[in-house]
Swiss-Prot record:
Family the UniProt entry places it in: Belongs to the TRAFAC class translation factor GTPase superfamily. Classic translation factor GTPase family. LepA subfamily.
Domain of life: Bacteria
tr-type G domain ranges (all copies): 6-188
UniProt entry keywords in alphabetical sequence: Cell inner membrane, Cell membrane, GTP-binding, Hydrolase, Membrane, Nucleotide-binding, Protein biosynthesis
CDD domains (alphabetical): EF4_II, EF4_III, LepA, lepA_C
Record-linked HAMAP family: LepA
UniProt-annotated binding residues for GTP: 18-23, 135-138
Compartments it resides in: Cell inner membrane
Single GO term (MF): translation elongation factor activity
Protein name in UniProt: Elongation factor 4
PROSITE patterns found in the cross-reference section: G_TR_1 (PS00301), G_TR_2 (PS51722)
Gene name as annotated: lepA
Record carries keyword Protein biosynthesis: yes
InterPro entries given in the database record: EF-4, EFG_III/V, EFG_V-like, EFTu-like_2, G_TR_CS, LepA_C_sf, LepA_CTD, LepA_IV
Length: 601
């Protein structure tokens, strides 16, 4: 190992949401004097307003700290802050590939949760040295010994050296830094070998093009050097290099073991994919990093501007968002009910919420979003296989030989007293139990196969409510399985509304259709004529509700007298309503599309 690397330590922090990861990062920055008290704002590394508000980290960040250890030597510590949510699992695995060690933060009041575990297993897969930290010991309900035991039982790590700390109060921070220096191995790698670096994040800067966050493993990268991206063979010239300490500053070179920023005139963020390998164009490395994959969206929904005039603005906003988020996809689509808009693809539910919230918040757009749907695999009668992300595109029933839907393997961690309620919820969602094991006396891990379509709506919210907020969920895609699925159309006055179509399991179709019609009846405003709301599978109507018409009393001015006069007036009114119904069209309000989302409740 090169002597010059022996002072470098690359590490990340793993934690479940809300276990105090970003606060701990703030304290490390303060303790090492990287940021002054005045500059330190809470959650320094979560730059997006949304990240701070939701208390989650969405994009990976890095920061370089200088630290003088108790042995008198100066160390360079690179903290690679990773997203903790399961939607961003691939980004996490790439960020981990860039480290040699990880701090495992466990909340002293909550214990080990599902996403902590999922991320720990990833860290172990990458052979990282794990430093356990038990955080929030200042809280009255903290149970340090219990959690220490849990780390040993559930994860199988030796926790006798686990550092008890409180990031909020600044307790134990010095001890954590010492552990990083002494336990995390220094990076290996030869600065003179051919260049080999991994991209673990990229974003778009309007002045400099795409900025890549990289970790150099072999060789050295310098300005004016020609580099090549492995996955697409494109070549670029390096313009500038930098590190965050914690604000960007330029450097002359990045050597093996270092983490930094490379700007190389890349114009399209899709060229700099997370997990890709960078090498020298003239003297390339032999092998790229293993494990690179193009992330595929799992959940889709339509996004339409409420004002048709905002279409261009929405397109620009989506373009800018996708510059920073290579996992997010979008393509134009039209809907008879909603006009022009886009079909967007996301990694998961949280990702979807974040994208929609950013569109509304950062670009001030008023949007209608359709119900999320997943990618179905359709085999038609001629044997051709097609993937469909929009229920409206499903071929007619008689042409479908089989329909397959994506399944997830879900790992749920919960308290033992909530097991019954959780099992019931999973059964309702067509889940198949795979495993149930008790971790100690208080916690349990439940493994289920559940169709993604059942998780997409509000599984997570329901899980939180049946477990009073204690259960945590982690999932991975298992593959496609055949299912008895049908397309449920909603007709309003006999006209199908494409944006309200959903694909459901046949057993559920009747119930779902009835619920939907009832919901829609409440939100569609009364007209001067009756409005029929029907749910149909193919040509068969399975549920109907009617929105009653406004009715003027045409007999008000008749007193007594002949019945035929009254009958004439009523007939005339009926005739008029019939004519209106033929030409009238029903305005469908925004709430109607939300009703589809809420039907599950």
């Amino acid at each position: 190992m090169a002597e010059k690397n022996s002072h470098i330590r690359n590490f990340s922090i793993i934690a479940h949401i809300d276990h105090g990861k970003s606060t701990l990062a703030d304290r490390l920055l303060e303790h090492t004097g990287t940021v002054t008290k005045r500059e330190a704002q809470a959650q320094f590394l979560d730059n997006m307003e949304l990240e701070r508000e939701r208390g989650i980290t969405i994009k990976a960040q890095t920061v370089r700290m200088k630290y003088r250890a108790q042995d008198g030597r100066d160390y360079e510590l690179n903290l690679i802050d990773t997203p903790g949510h399961v939607d961003f699992a691939y980004e996490v695995s790439r960020s981990m590939a860039a480290c040699e060690g990880a701090i495992l933060v466990v909340d002293a009041t909550q214990g080990v949760e599902a996403q902590t575990l999922a991320n720990v297993y990833q860290a172990l897969d990458h052979d990282l040295e794990i430093v356990p930290v038990i955080n929030k010991i200042d809280l009255p309900s903290a149970d340090v010994e219990g959690v220490r035991q849990e780390i040993e039982e559930v994860i199988g790590l030796d926790a006798k050296d686990a550092v008890p700390a409180s990031a909020k109060e600044g307790i134990g921070i010095g001890e954590i830094l010492e552990q990083i220096v002494h336990r995390v191995p220094a990076p290996e790698g030869d600065p003179d070998a051919p260049l080999k670096a991994i991209v673990f994040d990229s974003w778009y800067d309007s002045y400099r093009g795409v900025v890549m966050l990289v970790r150099v493993f072999e060789g050295t990268v310098r300005p004016k050097q020609k580099i090549r991206l492995w996955s697409n063979r494109k070549e670029f010239e390096v313009q500038e290099l930098g590190v965050f300490a914690p604000f960007a500053k330029a450097v002359v070179e990045l050597q093996a073991g270092e983490v930094g920023v490379v700007v190389a005139n890349v114009k399209d963020v899709h060229d700099a994919k997370v997990g890709d390998t960078i090498t020298d164009a003239t003297r390339p490395t032999e092998e790229p990093f293993p494990g690179f994959k193009v992330v595929k969206p799992m959940v889709f929904s339509g996004v339409f501007p409420i004002e048709a005039a905002d279409y261009e603005q929405l397109r620009d906003a989506l373009e800018k968002l996708s510059l920073n988020d290579s996992a997010f996809t979008y393509e134009p689509e039209t809907s008879q009910a909603l006009g022009f808009g886009f079909r967007c693809g996301y990694l998961g539910l949280l990702h979807m919420e974040i994208v929609q919230e950013r569109l509304e918040r950062e670009y001030q757009l008023a949007l209608i979003t359709t119900a999320p749907s997943v990618v179905y695999r359709v085999t038609d009668t001629s044997g051709a296989v097609e993937e469909i992300d929009n229920p409206a595109k499903l071929p007619p029933v008689q042409k479908i030989a089989k329909l397959e839907e994506p399944h997830l393997t879900c790992h749920i961690h919960a308290r033992t007293e909530d097991v019954g309620a959780i099992l019931k919820l999973c059964q309702e969602r067509r889940g198949l139990q795979r495993d149930l094991k008790y971790l100690g006396t208080k916690r349990v891990q439940i493994t289920y196969d559940i169709p993604l379509a059942e998780v997409v709506f509000d599984f997570f919210d329901k899980l939180k409510s049946v477990s009073r907020g204690y259960a945590s969920l982690d999932y991975e895609l298992k593959g496609y399985e055949e299912a008895d699925l049908v397309k449920l159309d909603i007709l309003i006055n006999g006209e199908p509304v494409d944006a309200l179509s959903v694909i459901v399991h046949r057993e559920r179709a009747y119930q779902r259709g009835r619920d939907l019609c009832q919901r829609l009846r409440e939100v569609i405003p009364k007209q001067m004529y009756e409005v029929a709301i029907q749910a149909a599978i193919g040509a068969k109507v399975i549920a109907r509700e009617t929105v009653k018409a406004f009715r003027k009393n045409v007999l008000a001015k008749c007193y007594g007298g002949d019945i035929s006069r009254k009958r004439k007036l009523l007939e005339k009114q009926k005739e008029g309503k019939k004519r209106m119904k033929q030409v009238g069209s029903v305005e469908i309000p925004q709430e109607a599309f939300l009703a589809v989302l809420k039907v599950e409740e």
